[in-house]
Amino acid sequence: MGANLVYGAFYKHDEPKKLLKYLYDHLDKDAIEIDTINFSGPLFENVDNRLMSLQLVKNGMTEAVMFNPSGNNILPARELYKKNILALRGSFRPVTKVNIDMFEKSLEVFLKEREVNENKTVVIFEITLSNLTSQGEIDEKDFMDRAKLLCSLGHVVMISNFKEYYRLVDYLSQYTKKQMALAMGVNSFVEVFDENYYTDLSGGILEAFGKMFYNNLKVYLYPTKDADGNIITSNNLKLHPRMKDFYKFFKYNGKVVDIFDFEPKYLDIFSRKILQQINNLSLIHI
């Protein structure tokens, strides 16, 4: 890889994306992982390292990358080692009041956990590659807009290839055995119990949940409204009959915690509707 890096620096410095691909020339991607990269110097003044991080995940060079509120790429091992971790997954397209309320209220609950020290806590906003490619090809401007907005909230942003939640937890567990929590809405939580997501695992959903909940993990559940306007929480959510007893095990063992101090008016906010309104306004101005 060192020889490839020297070659790329000399001959592909004006094409950073191609330079990245040349790093694996005649190398197997399974043999080595690049989990962070930073371009600096006069020749790379116009290169945004967040976009280069995105390329690492997109090209299968690593499973996840992280950058700090300043937009600088950071090593996951250094940032997460022996830390308490609160993670929020979303498309954040756009960031809505629901996202902010879920973040703020779940953080309040997390910091009240018995063994959580605020000074040793990391909050992660995670966007999966599938969320970035939901419209087809990745729109780099759209990605940068989301990244900058999330960075402005003062916490770490992660881009990952972890479609399933258990893979995210499994990844984070490499670096810490401290308290971890996932903040999510009821609808996302119900999807976690869909067995179709785990057909590639020999142990199926049991194996996935074993990986997800074996550590000090809790799920902070943000409520939603059903079609009749009823508020849905962990106490009245609907699951497939086969999953009910399975769910009760985690519920009664304190692994699922409701966020009660939420803003009821925010439950009528849906990011897709907001995005549609933004797009409609853009078309009017055009």
Put a short name on every predicted segment.
Residues M1-I284:
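Nucleotidyltransferase catalytic core that binds NTPs
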